[in-house]
Regions:
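Short, conserved beta-strand element in jelly-roll/cupin
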Residues: 157-176, 216-219, 224, 248-252
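Non-heme Fe(II)/2-oxoglutarate
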Residues: 2-21, 65-73, 197, 222-224, ...
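Short, flexible, surface-exposed loop segments at domain boundaries
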Residues: 256-282, 294-334
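Double-stranded beta-helix
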Residues: 174-232
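Non-heme Fe(II)-dependent double-stranded beta-helix
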Residues: 2-38, 44-152, 158
Length: 334
């Protein structure tokens, strides 16, 4: 049985450690069996540390410019005591405000030769990374008092029609206090008497406590999990360390990948997207089209069909998943 990780925080239940999948690399059938059983793969020390270091360096450069970390450290983000009331790395999807989102270091990272080669081996194909990246620099002491789980949810309800895998990686050491990410093992599969999984998140107390898994993370580790796997970030209870991580979403490039571009035309029946290659692609929209926009607490919630032409604007950067010409999913690039 996996070791238990315990916490001095009374709101944090003991959790078993994630199963490590390194021994499955190179065995496609074994990887698929583990995925079907658990809903995730966890790998230790598989991502090139130099590439991870360069990615972390972008985070640290941004945070030094903000004046909130010890400028002498290049291995971690250590709070220097500066006020954090207006700390802008909030990952809330608001355009033009998050300085890490403006830098968008994911693109350089996934083209690093060793990183690209590893993910192609893992996916068994060249990888299509959707323009949806989460950059986390969670301040020390962040989170609600008495609640360690930041937001219980699955990504599937908010990503209709996209067969994505979520790839989460720590960029600096994450110990028990700093938190990291926890997930519920084996609860990705359809089952009778399941708990509701609405787009706005999963209710407290419905996930069996013995399903939760976590780890103490190091740079080079990688956690890949299903869109249907319940998970949550854990509140950062450290006194001084920011929690640095990035999660990206990908699928085999040979699959039915979404169209990425800007909105060129839109009405109550269809949307046209202009791609960087100069193409214009038009898709029907209907009552089943899941379209989301950035709108505060309702970010991630689907728009009604009549709201789509009102709230999506010409020129908006989006990506669109489609099935036989009908858009199943529309969302802003992020």
């Amino acid at each position: 049985m996996a070791d238990m990780i315990t916490s001095t925080s009374t709101d944090t239940p003991p959790m078993r450690e994630l199963r490590v999948s390194n021994h499955l690399l190179g065995d496609r059938a074994a990887l698929e069996r583990a995925w079907e059983r658990d809903g995730y793969w966890f790998f230790r020390d598989v991502l090139d540390k130099d590439a991870v270091g360069r990615l972390r360096g972008v985070y640290l450069e941004v945070m030094r410019d903000l004046g909130v970390i010890d400028p002498t450290r290049d291995d971690a983000a250590v709070h220097n005591g500066a006020p954090l009331d207006d700390f802008p790395i909030r990952n809330d999807g608001t355009a033009g405000k998050d300085p890490l989102m403006l830098r968008y270091p994911r693109d350089a990272f996934v083209t690093e030769p060793k990183i690209k080669a590893f993910f192609e081996q893992l996916f068994g194909d060249e990888v299509f990374w959707v323009p949806n990246t989460e950059y986390h620099a969670l301040p020390p002491g962040a989170g609600r008092e008495g609640r360690r789980f930041n937001f219980l949810h699955c990504d599937g309800p908010n990503n209709k029609g996209l067969p994505l895998k979520i790839c989460w990686m720590p960029l600096a050491p994450i110990d028990e206090e700093t938190g990291g990410l926890a997930l519920a093992e084996g609860l990705h599969r359809p089952r009778m008497h399941d708990f509701p999984r609405p787009p706005e998140g999963i209710a407290d107390g419905v996930i069996p406590q013995d399903a939760w898994r976590r780890a103490l993370y190091q740079p080079g580790d990688l956690l890949v999990f299903s869109l249907e796997t319940p998970h949550s970030g854990l509140a950062n209870r450290s006194d001084s360390y920011f929690r640095l991580s990035m999660d990206i979403r990908g699928m085999p490039k040979s699959g039915n990948v979404p169209t990425v571009g800007t909105v060129a035309a839109l009405d109550a029946c269809a949307i046209t997207v202009a791609t960087e290659a100069g193409e214009q692609r038009t898709f029907r929209i209907d009552e089943d089209t899941f379209c989301r926009v950035t709108r505060g607490r309702l970010t991630g919630m689907p728009l009604a069909l009549k709201e789509i032409p009102q709230m999506v604007k010409i020129g908006d950067p989006v990506y669109v998943a489609a099935d036989h010409g009908t858009a199943t999913f529309i969302r802003p690039q992020h």
